[in-house]
């Protein structure tokens, strides 16, 4: 995998970067690599944090030094084709749309998209979204799959 980069991000972490775009293909590589890493049981791994295009690996340098860790991490790349990624779980989340208190953005999204509010709701609820990563606020998800017909600037 020529496009994979290993970036030292401090004295206790390494970032394995799989590309420079947000895509389901890169997400699948990150998930497979994370599973391979967990299965390898490399001593000293403290935590892994998947992102849109990379996997941050936190490690304990008193258990494993950087050079041997990097060798182990590079070795995992050849195993990704053998990893079975578990199927995604669909979680349905109830949503309340509209009104000043519950959904003040609905009118803006509809106007921006040139749609009725009902059309925006239909488009929004007829799509399955992929969770790429969890954010800094507990439970906050970064999703992919927004229909371009209702995509709006932040």
Language-model regions, residue ranges each:
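Conserved "landmark" site that anchors the functional core of diverse proteins
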Residues: 1-154
